[in-house]
Amino acid sequence: MTKHELIVWRYIREKQLGVKFKRQVPINRYIVDFFSLEIGLVIEIDGGHHYDPKITKKDKVRTNDLLNWGLTVIRYNNDEVLTNIEGVINSIGEKVDELKERYEIE
């Protein structure tokens, strides 16, 4: 787990946002950074190498596959985590609330 993933993990572990997240979860042929099975939410934290055009293309394929499997995917980059962790966590919390409402989870 990267330093940036650990920062996010501190805020989402132990149902702090109302759902359980697991880290480094295998989904088919991918390993995602964080996943909540309850609401089908994948969270990815992208490092600097994700700006490489080849990696960006692979990320798009990966995201499309996850979406096609019925999951919701949100991505943040390392800079966002370091400079705006409050905004990142608020954004995740809003998505969690939206999906809990969609799936009628209290």
Task: Please annotate each region the language model reported.
Residues M1-E106:
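Nucleic-acid endo/exonuclease domains
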